[in-house]
Amino acid sequence: SLLSPDIEKQRILKKVCEDNKIEFIAYSPLSFGILCQDPNYISKTNKSLLRNSIFNGYNKPTIRLRKSIKEIAEKRSVSMAQVAVNWCCYQGAIPLIGLRKQSHVLDISKVLQWDLTKEEYNKLEEASTSCKKLPGNPFTSN
């Protein structure tokens, strides 16, 4: 995910996986939906207390990144979710996406119909480096 805490560490791990012919899976490429939120989104109370606290803590610190995602999405006439997932695919990762609605499945299935350009990828990388990252997953080993 563009909000992963240590992208460089993940790149090293991906190289090890490639060298050993192991597929690399990108967990939570939408960062709990944060990367799908319009940059002008004003947080409202969500049904889930956990989800609401995550959104409130990451709304402002990710505005620049979400603006970049939205610009690419609008230019290509795709969703912000497609852009965030395509960033993972660009690196050769298999995204593991939590989708709850049929409309989301149909939207994300279109990711396979296009690829980010090098310029778009670099724009997302640059915006990602300057924003608040999600905490590491407590269920993974280091």
Whereabouts are the PLM-identified features?
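Beta/alpha (TIM)-barrel catalytic core signal, keyed to glycine-rich beta->alpha loops juxtaposed to Asp/Glu
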Residues: 1-142
